[in-house]
Regions:
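Glycine-rich, aromatic-lined ligand/substrate-binding cores of catalytic
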Residues: 226-311
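Glycine-rich oxoanion-binding loops at beta->alpha junctions
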Residues: 92-122, 134
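Bacterial Sec-dependent N-terminal signal peptides
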Residues: 1-22
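Glycine-rich, charge-decorated loop segments at or immediately adjacent to ligand/cofactor-binding or catalytic sites
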Residues: 84-88, 158-180
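Glycine/threonine-rich flexible loop motifs
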Residues: 131-143
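Conserved anion/nucleotide-ligand pocket segment
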Residues: 180-256
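Short internal beta-strands
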Residues: 71-79, 160
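Conserved functional hotspot residues or short segments at active or partner-binding sites
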Residues: 281-392
């Protein structure tokens, strides 16, 4: 009997260990397996933040700093900083890293592209940041500008690849138009682009999407085990908050459902509450009424429930609000970005005296347009507050982009 119990216990322990082992090895994991061969003999600058960790949660900064055959000489901080303690939009200052003593150069302060002085003595830049798969999240812009700086200064850029938490099959939104190019829409890609950062880097380089068509010497350290159909949960990897308001991998799915409208600052989208990007709320909304209206739209892969809340900060701080919480029910069929436009449509119908576009601060329209990647979206929507008026325009580039981007797939 004791032997049977012991065997059962060992079996359970074995299953538990197996369940915890990640199915995917990221670029830094693979670089370690290669004994850092691509970095040998080079003076390295590292662009990273707290998401740059291996499968054991050891920081890429510490890994490269401690590796006997790697010469790490500088760090570069994107939005939120190398250690992740800077609020969204706040400038990052040049400083010294307390743990390693290495200089940290800001890529979100006076300049967003590394200068010649910042790159002096660097042979290769290494990029290791977990992105969230939406164009307006600025880390891919930092990567692209780093590619430009590398090209202009004759140095190599090495991307340590990581999963796209939205998978590799989702594509939504029009590509960025010339008058809306900005740090939140740096390249002519859709809002949801369905590529890993390594794949995106290859496409930006080969298709000459960087400024002035420059191309850099690019190396991508591929992952092992990642599939396009995977959600982040499928990878078995731990999630590190990619910004203060993306605390969980699941939040990456909700960011594109509310983030565009959130730029107007008119509705609470859960930032400042415990559900960032997962809701819409205001003091004048009837939660039951709006939830029923949104459910009646029968949008695929998503449903809604009434919610009552009092945000701790940001839009609606301290006010008693009502609204809807978004619940994604099918990650394969859901269309994420239309949710916010249908929401604005229903608000205009139910509460015309509070219709979003007519009552939001017009000074914020410019950022809304930049995040959309086109002024046409706002201008067409404002005519009747109908999603159907912009649906074709919003989706016009999806099929061509899917065809183009497939050329740069590193994973199936």
């Amino acid at each position: 009997m004791k032997k049977l119990l012991l065997c059962a216990l060992l079996g359970i322990m074995s299953l538990s260990t197996t369940a915890k082992a990640p199915k995917v090895l990221t670029g830094i994991d693979m670089l370690e397996r290669q004994n850092f061969k691509p970095l040998q003999g080079k003076r390295i600058g590292l662009i990273t933040n707290p998401t740059g960790v291996n499968r054991y949660l050891k920081s890429t900064i510490d890994i490269l700093h401690d590796a006997p055959n790697v010469q790490l000489v500088a760090l570069y901080g994107p939005e939120h900083g190398v250690r992740g303690d800077i609020y969204a939009g706040a400038k990052v200052q040049d400083q010294k890293d307390e743990k390693t003593g290495l200089p940290i150069f800001s890529l979100y302060g006076k300049t967003r592209k590394a200068t010649k002085e910042m790159l002096r003595g660097i042979d290769a830049l290494v990029y290791d940041i977990q992105d969230i798969g939406s164009r307006s999240f600025t880390f891919i812009s930092t990567m692209g500008l780093a590619m430009e700086a590398a090209a202009e200064n004759g140095i190599e850029l090495i991307v340590l690849d990581r999963p796209n938490p939205l998978g590799g099959l989702h594509v939504e939104g029009n590509v960025v138009e010339d008058d809306c190019v900005s740090f939140v829409s740096q390249f002519r890609i859709p809002y949801i682009y369905g590529l890993t950062c390594g794949e995106l880097a290859k496409m930006l380089n080969a298709e000459r999407m960087l400024a002035n068509g420059v191309q850099c010497k690019l190396t991508v350290i591929k992952m092992k085990g990642w599939k396009r159909k995977m959600t982040f949960a499928d990878t078995g990897l731990p999630w590190i908050a990619s910004s203060p308001h993306i605390p969980q991998a699941l939040t990456a799915w909700y960011y594109p459902t509310t983030g565009i409208v959130g730029e107007l600052g008119y509705l609470s989208i859960g930032v400042g509450y415990t559900l960032p990007f997962q809701l819409f709320a205001a003091s004048w909304i009837d939660a039951e009424e709006l939830a029923n209206a949104m459910i009646a739209q029968q949008m695929p892969g998503v449903t809604f429930r009434p919610i009552h809340l009092r945000p701790f900060y940001s839009t609606g701080k301290g006010e008693q609000l009502q609204g809807i919480q978004i619940h994604i029910t099918n990650y394969k069929t859901v269309q994420l970005t239309p949710i916010q436009f249908v929401l604005m449509q229903e608000i205009a119908r139910l509460y015309p005296e509070h219709s979003v576009m007519e009552h939001a601060n017009q000074q914020r329209f410019s950022m809304f347009d930049k995040v959309c990647g086109s002024k046409q979206i706002r201008q067409r929507f404002m005519r009747r507050n109908q999603w159907s008026d912009i649906e074709t325009y919003w989706n016009k580039d999806v099929k061509p982009f899917k065809i183009l981007s497939k050329k740069y797939y590193l994973y199936r």
